[in-house]
Each structure stands twice: as C-alpha cells, then as structure tokens.
Amino acid sequence: MSFWLPSQGKLYLPPPTAVTQYLDTDDFVTRTDTFYHTNTERLLFVGHPYFDIKREDKVLVPKVSGSQFRVFRLKFPDPNKFSFPDPNVYNSDNQRLVWALRGIEICRGQPLGIGVTGHPSFNKFKDAENNNNKTPDQTTDDRVNMAVDPKQVQMFIVGCTPCDGEHWDVAQACDRLEPGACPPIELKNTIIEDGEMCDTGFGNMNFQKLQASKSGAPLDIVNQIVKYPDFLKMGSDPHGNSMFFYAKREQMYVRHLWSRGGTIGEEIPPNGEASPYYLPGAGRATLPTSVYFGSPSGSLVSSDQQIYNRPFWIQRAQGRNNGICWNNQLFVTAVDSTRGTNFTISVHRDKPSLEDQDTYTAAEFKHYLRHVEEWEVSLVLQLCIVDLTPEALAHINGMDPRIIESWNLGFIHAPNNIEDQYRYLQSIATRCPPKEDAAATEDPYAKYTFWDVDLTERFSMNLDQYSLGRKFLFQIGKKSRGIKRSAPKAVTFESSSRSKKAPKRRRKNV
C-alpha cells in the first residue's frame, strides 16, 4: 500500500529583484604600452612624540609619533591634457585617458629603533604576575610613573580613495544612565587622517571619552581616538577603490601583567552570596581587584622583517578596481613603528655653551623630546584608455559623478530664451545681482587632514633613469637604454701543474 507524504525538502526561490552587477575595470579599460615614473621628494617630519606644544592655541611644535598614520594624497596630472608623441594614442570623441598603478615603493629613512611611550601618572596598582605578598590596601592615589614600548606595526594601504578606519566609541543609551554606570559602546567607521594614532597595544577606541581617569593609557593616546583599518569593509567594497592592496606586519607580546586601582564597577557574581567562581577563605573577607591588563611590548626590530624599501608590483588588485586612479589621485596610508627612536636633547638653562671647568648639576639642564621621520614614495603608472560606452558611463556615474564632470564630455544643453544683461551690476539703481548658478567644484575631502603631494610636474617616461623604473623594466622584460659597454676580452691562463708533453717524433721509413 502506498501513502502520500508531504515533501520534507525546502524549496529555495531566487530573490525577487535582480542583484546589482558591478563592472570590473578590466571590462571597459584598455591598457597601453606607455609607462611613466614619478616620485615624491624627501618628506620629513619633526615634532614631539607625545603631544602638541601650543601657545595661545597656536601649535609651536606638532605631535610626531612613530605610531601615527601617515596619509599621503598624491595628485597626478590629467592625462587628457598631455601632449603625446603619437597623436593617435586615443580618440577624444569617444575615449578618455586614466592612470593605472603598476608599481610602488615606499622608502623609509633613519635607522631602526624602538620607541618608548608612557605616563607619569599611570594607573598601575599591583603586579598580578609575580605577587608574593598579599595585596596592600589601596590609597587615595596609587598611580606610578610607567613607560612601555608600543606594539610593533608596519602597514600600508593603497587606493584611490581614503582608507576606512574603525574604532569603538560611546553609543546612545536606550535609557538614562545612572552616575557611575558603564556606557554602551559601538563600532564606528571613519576615514583615517594623517596624524591619527594606530593601535599601540591598548586597543582601538576613543580614549578621550572612555578613559575618564586620564591614567589608563600612555600620553600619546590618552586624549586621542585610536583607529585600526577596516579591512573587512574595504575588502567587500563593490568598487574596490579604497584598497587596491595592502601589506602589514604586526608583532606584540605581553611583558608584564598588572591590575588597575580604583573601585570595581562589576564585581565577581554573585555579590554577597556563595559564588561559583571562588571559595571564601578565612582572613579574606574581600577579594582584590579583578581588573587585569597587560603591558604591551613590540620586542625586537630587525631589517630582515621589513615591508618598506622594496618594490611591489600590481598584477591583479584584490577588488574590482584593478589599480585605476580615478580623479587622478592616489591615497597611501602607512604606519611604521620600527623607526620610533625618540631623541633626547639637553641644553643648559642659562649658558649657550659650556666650558671645560663647568660641573654637572641636574637642575641646570633642560631636556626635550623630539621624533623625526623620513619618507619617500616612488610610483610606476600605466596609461590606460576608457571607452565611453553607455555601460561604462553608467557605472562610473554611479560610483562617482565627479569623474565624468572632470572629463568635459561636452553635452549639448537645451537652447535658452533671450536673457537680460545689466551693465552696472553693483549699482543701487538696478536689482541685486543674481547668485552664481555654477558653483565651484568642491573637494569632498576638504574637511579631512592629509599630506597633499603635488606630482603634476614630476612625471617622466625615462624609466631607466630611476631605481624603481629599472626594476620595472626588468620585470616586464625590457632592456634599459643605457650606455653600451664593450665586452671584456677573454683571458686564459695555463696551469703550471700540468707537465708539458714532449713533441712526437716522426717515424722514419726503413
């Protein structure tokens, strides 16, 4: 006998609306065999490693730390305004030219060194690692002078839009918070700007709002927002503009285990009753603090583990943008804490120079801190052609309409009727002058802080005259146009160890 049974399997239907299809730049961009080299000048930074030195809200000495992000905004010339030797490079009626990144080398100067950061009033109550004695009672102020070496970070992100960062900040509470309650926190995404701090081993959060004691972090981050690149968001970007590729190397270990001083906000549960976490003992009515933390340490720095001072070649980017520099610009976000040495400069309080008979007195000398950085960026760019097809224009317009506006495609406007033209616009006898309709093109990143580097006049087709250019020519199998050298003459030497053979005698016919 047969029975009818309902189907146990699930039926999956496609989504009612079609999924948006994003074009890859290789679908509508044609690459040429024309390459250019460009590089920045030597970019130098000098400042105080912990904070800005101000006088009446004017920055006298800026903050320059080895754990700061450096964001270089490299501006390129418009290739559509170039004069090429071959006039038939592209058809200006239905094509436009753009730059594509093929190679980059980020160079760092200065010797390797470990930076030191700290706080003269650091909230370190008791050693929780090797605690031989019982925990003493807390006093009103148990803060100490403490210094650590930050986490070792080497990282750079390359894209045609700024790098996205993430940090934890105070969130909006559903109900009114009571005094002393822990605020809710949320993950926020913001653009990483030049001079902002990276993670030094204390986390990526807003220390200005989440550290009310001003003693839970070193001086360089205690009043700052520490950010970390949001690789997940940039990796899933449908356009792939913010991150063509990245390279990073992080290293840290916990050097000491300490505990915080103060009142515990959340005690070990349950409060005042038998706890599943510990057994009460005689002579211990109250437990010591359970707020632990570790002091970071970046450990050894070595030239064997460096991502800088070496070229990187882009064959295929991680996203859909395969290295096309839209709007003729490139953003390089970098950080390097392996050259974090802080200079200690000492000067006499009264005398400009000391004499041989002077003696040392500690109070007569003033000590200053300075940190210096040295950067240089070299690029190899490839000239590419964009076909102005409807699909390509629709894709570019949805991504960034400013790109099409900068191309001056020359759309024909509808004819207007005759308009009135007054001669004396500023005269009080006539009407007020009308407002200008065509507003100037605004920079979308004007409110952000970057290091703007103008490379419009630093392009060269002679790649063999530059170090990165010669490396690139070797990669693609082209010989550099150098001076031909004559081949050395071959010289042979006879070995003295070989015995000379006697000449053979001819046999006489008998």
UniProtKB/Swiss-Prot annotation:
GO cellular-component term (any): T=7 icosahedral viral capsid
Record-linked Pfam families: Late_protein_L1
Gene Ontology biological process terms, A to Z: endocytosis involved in viral entry into host cell; virion attachment to host cell
InterPro entries: Capsid_L1_Papillomavir, Capsid_L1_sf_Papillomavir, dsDNA_vir_gr_I_capsid
Annotated stretches, region: Disordered: 482-510
Stretches with biased composition (Basic residues): 498-510
GO molecular function: structural molecule activity
Domain of life of the source: Viruses
Keyword terms of this UniProt record: Capsid protein, Disulfide bond, Host nucleus, Host-virus interaction, Late protein, T=7 icosahedral capsid protein, Viral attachment to host cell, Viral penetration into host cytoplasm, Virion, Virus endocytosis by host, Virus entry into host cell
Compartments in which it is found: Virion; Host nucleus
Keyword presence, Cell wall biogenesis/degradation: no
Protein function: Forms an icosahedral capsid with a T=7 symmetry and a 50 nm diameter. The capsid is composed of 72 pentamers linked to each other by disulfide bonds and associated with L2 proteins. Binds to heparan sulfate proteoglycans on cell surface of basal layer keratinocytes to provide initial virion attachment. This binding mediates a conformational change in the virus capsid that facilitates efficient infection. The virion enters the host cell via endocytosis. During virus trafficking, L1 protein dissociates from the viral DNA and the genomic DNA is released to the host nucleus.
HAMAP family: PPV_L1
Self-association state and partner proteins as the record states: Self-assembles into homopentamers. The capsid has an icosahedral symmetry and consists of 72 capsomers, with each capsomer being a pentamer of L1. Interacts with the minor capsid protein L2; this interaction is necessary for viral genome encapsidation. Interacts with protein E2; this interaction enhances E2-dependent replication and transcription activation.
Family, similarity comment: Belongs to the papillomaviridae L1 protein family.
Name of the protein in question: Major capsid protein L1
The species this protein was found in: Bovine papillomavirus type 3
